[in-house]
Design a protein with these regions (language model features):
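Short acidic/His/Gly/Ser-rich catalytic and metal-binding motifs that mark active-site loops
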Residues: 395-402, 469, 572-576
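Mobile active-site "lid"/loop adjacent to the S-adenosyl-L-methionine
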Residues: 387-389, 393-415, 419, 430, ...
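Short, glycine/acidic-enriched loop or turn micro-motifs at the edges of active sites
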Residues: 373, 395, 441, 613, ...
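Conserved proline-anchored active-site loop of SAM-dependent methyltransferases
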Residues: 381-399, 608-622
Length: 802
């Protein structure tokens, strides 16, 4: 293979990335990249042939050096960053600046982290005289970073006794039916044990896992790296350079920069797709019966065909028992039953018509989305409106959580940096940011936030707290040759203008205040309080379904809450496992922890946000404390229930519906639970929230259309720099030109059948929704939009970019 052939082959491989089988947006991306590359290669060959006319002997060296440079910065996923760069190369040259003498550097710093996924390929597997074939062509690649299991179905048994399987990602807990597979094979005289079958599955699953990134500025990055590489080559080379040699190096630079320009053109296009605002989809509302004040609408709900499915859901969630009938709904104890409009879509507008300031009357928003896409899309609507943000991100431990939790440190930093920065943009000027980490990530985490806030406090959460401070809990880990880890770290971040409520607590073992696990909120009686009697102390709770502050008479010793929280039970306590164990207990945080965070940094109806929502503890606590809330989560555990290997578990929507019903003693699935906080604040139920999905990067890639026509209809010196995607359709299939009436019609159903136009426009424009009517959305600024005859100019950022 000549060096020229080697270069073009390598360039194609590294630009397009490893071949991925299956379906979805990333498959469409590979097709688009391949078409783009084929045209670029033709133009590049012409330019190289012209450039080396005077120096034919330099041709092989040119290709050798081009290959040597570019192969350092490309990965199996097609991402562009430091990959196999030799350590001695000066890639850390920008450590110091005039303002700072220490800067954290990591090799994926210039990238958007997209997801971690395995690149599956169809493959044969043979061992112990058995032959298998796994067809990966139907695997629909992951949209984001959720964990998803594979499941296998028999496709056929071939004449040579090769057992062929179709492989897919599991949907809603679908599992491989090994027993049925073994029975089918036995009928076909294929002798195989369950152990050998599982071994074959494991062999297939051990395919390469890669991180997918997008370079934020590929052109600047690669040009900078080429300059560093060429300067090093220049100064370490000959002491004297002939004119011809200088000209050859100029040719090398010129060609290298053309390659860089064409690579960055496409990478920049991906950046635009990644950052484009996303459509809100598949939206519904959950509202308790007591909030539906029009009895005629309630009667319509009770007579609606969807009431059967609604009751079935309540039964699955444990809200009502199997004997529950429609006639029972009139009972006073069921006034907080959560009605989901997905079962009553034709009544949804009637229900919404009861509210004259819709967004302000909602208690919260649940958003199913990868969190970068969610934060970026809702930023115009919620910019500087969030009072407190709490996140409990993956700690980089590899534990068995429902999301990927094993990253290279550099990938984790890239994942967190952009999401933290976006989250901060949503905070009010007096808002606070809470970052919850363990010892695997707290050092890196603090580096990401230290320049974002004027004040950063460090709180130690004692995960081994007991009722008796002298006592301790221990298990098998206690006997290891190390100091047992018994804490996690909370970084409490704020600026000079902040809202903070001072909390006090009694001695939990001896107190007679009767406040349960609650803290006391201190309110100064005078301008400069210096002693306890200078304060009034109150607790927040519900009285007769009204939330407010209740005075507490202090007649015993109390203590200010410090920065070591050793009085909050974690899930090492059996009491917590019984009362609050909803789902993935190993990573779930106690409600009392979130209660303290929320009460210290917000007031009633302030917005609380968590965009690593997990099982929904933050939104559950915020709701019970009469705060508005935003929760972002992805994957199957966003739903009411989701399947695990150990059975069904309560999901985020299920938990929030349970909260709306009042956190009453509900059997899920075999024990009765009611969180301590619900008793302490006298929570009885009620609420109104919206949930929806967002279009994902993967969805957008799947729907984007790029033509195979001539990209370079007019060649020029700027052919590599000019924006070449101007003629491409992208997502313009949603538009139809009515030439007769000189109008542009918008049909968003051509993209997705379930777009929520009102929420999409609210996120896009930043305007809050006042009312939604048939064919119209009204915003709080008085403006109205006809949703049946949309002006294409309004939605342009969603479907076309340049």
């Amino acid at each position: 293979m000549t060096k020229e052939t080697k270069f073009y082959k390598a360039l194609q491989d590294i630009f397009i990335g490893a071949k991925i089988e299956g379906e979805g947006g990333f498959i469409n991306l590979m097709r688009i990249k391949a078409g783009y590359y084929s045209q670029i290669e033709k133009l590049l060959k012409e330019d190289i042939n012209k450039a080396v006319v005077k120096y034919p002997a330099f041709r092989e060296e040119l290709f050798d050096k081009l290959h040597s440079f570019f192969s350092r910065y490309f990965t199996e996923s097609g991402s562009i960053y430091f990959n196999s760069t030799p350590f001695h190369n000066n890639i850390y040259e920008k450590v110091y600046t005039d303002e700072k003498d220490v800067i954290l550097f990591w090799k994926t710093q210039m990238l958007y982290y997209v997801k971690t996924d395995r690149i599956f390929k169809s493959m044969p597997v043979e061992f112990d005289g058995l032959k298998f074939y796994f067809d990966a062509s139907q695997i629909e690649n992951k949209k984001a970073n959720e964990k998803r299991a594979l499941y296998f179905e028999i496709k056929q048994v071939r004449e040579d006794e090769t057992v062929a399987f179709t492989v897919k990602y599991s949907e809603r807990g679908t599992k491989t039916k090994s027993d049925e597979i073994l029975k089918d094979l036995k009928k076909k005289n294929i002798k195989i044990t369950e152990e050998l079958l599982e071994k074959a599955f494991r062999v297939f699953e051990k395919q390469s896992e890669v991180d997918f990134f997008i370079n934020k500025n590929a052109n600047a990055f690669l040009q900078e790296q080429f300059k560093l590489w060429s300067y090093q080559y220049f100064w370490e080379g000959a002491k004297e350079w002939s004119g011809d040699r200088v000209n050859q190096l100029q040719i090398l630079k010129s060609i290298a920069f053309k390659v860089i320009d064409f690579i960055s053109q496409f990478e920049d296009e991906l950046v635009k797709i990644w950052n484009k605002p996303k459509f809100a989809r598949n939206s519904n509302y959950v509202i308790t019966l007591d909030r539906i004040t029009d009895k005629k609408i309630v009667e319509k709900i009770l007579k609606h065909a969807g009431i059967k499915d609604q009751i079935k859901e309540w039964q699955e969630l444990g809200i009502v028992d199997g004997k529950f009938k429609v006639k029972d709904i009139g009972d006073k104890k069921y006034e907080h039953l959560p009605i989901d409009t997905k079962y009553f879509k034709d009544l949804e507008l009637e229900i919404l018509s009861l509210f004259d300031d819709l967004d302000n009357q909602l208690d919260g928003w649940l958003i199913k989305s990868e969190n970068y896409q969610a934060l970026n899309s809702i930023l115009p609507k919620f910019r500087e409106k969030v009072q407190a943000a709490y996140i409990d991100p993956p700690f980089n431990t590899g534990e068995d959580f429902p999301y990927v939790d094993r990253f290279q440190d550099s990938s984790w930093l890239s994942l967190m940096k952009d999401r933290i920065n976006l989250g901060i943009s949503l905070l009010k000027k007096d808002g606070s940011f809470w970052l919850h980490l363990d010892d695997n990530a707290n050092v890196f985490g603090k580096e990401l936030i230290k320049d974002k806030f004027s004040q950063i406090g460090e709180i130690i959460f004692d995960t081994n707290a007991t009722k008796d401070v002298e006592a301790d809990l221990f298990g098998y880990k206690s006997f290891g040759d190390n100091f047992q880890l018994k804490h996690q770290t909370l970084f409490y971040c704020r600026n000079d203008e902040y809202l903070f409520r001072k909390l006090w607590k009694p001695n939990r073992n001896t107190t007679e205040l009767g406040i349960g696990w609650l803290d006391l909120i201190a309110f100064p009686r005078i301008s400069s309080p210096k002693k306890i009697t200078d304060f009034k102390f109150k607790i927040e709770k519900w009285n007769n379904n009204v939330f407010g502050l209740s005075d507490v008479e202090i007649n015993e010793k109390i203590f200010p809450v410090g920065d070591i929280w050793n009085d909050i039970f974690s899930f090492t306590q059996s009491e917590m496992r019984v009362s609050e164990s909803f789902s993935f207990t190993s990573s779930q945080k106690p409600e009392n922890l979130l209660r303290r965070i929320i009460q210290s940094s917000s007031e009633a109806r302030g917005i609380i946000m968590d965009y690593f929502l997990g099982i929904g503890t933050t939104t559950a606590v915020a709701h019970k404390l009469n705060r508005k809330w935003i929760g972002v989560e992805m994957g199957d555990h966003f739903n009411e229930m989701y399947e695990t290997e150990s059975g069904k578990k309560l999901g985020v929507k299920g938990r929030m519906k349970w909260v709306l019903f009042g956190d009453k003693n509900i059997s899920l699935p075999d024990v009765e639970r009611r969180p301590h906080l619900s008793k302490d604040v006298n929570w009885n139920g009620g609420g109104f929230f919206k949930y929806y999905e967002l279009e994902q990067y993967e969805d957008a890639l799947k729907n984007c259309k790029y033509g195979n026509g001539d990209l370079f209809s007019k060649t020029s010196d700027k052919a590599y720099q000019d924006y070449i995607f101007m003629k491409d359709e992208k997502m313009l299939s949603a538009l139809e030109i009515d030439y007769k009436n000189k109008k542009v019609k918008v049909d968003l159903n051509k993209l997705y059948p379930d777009i929520d136009i009102a929420e999409t426009l609210s996120n896009l424009t930043g305007k809050w929704i006042k009312a939604i009517k048939d064919g119209e959305v009204e915003f709080t600024d008085g403006s109205k939009v006809n949703t049946k005859e949309l002006d294409y100019k309004i939605i342009k950022p969603l479907i076309w970019w340049e």
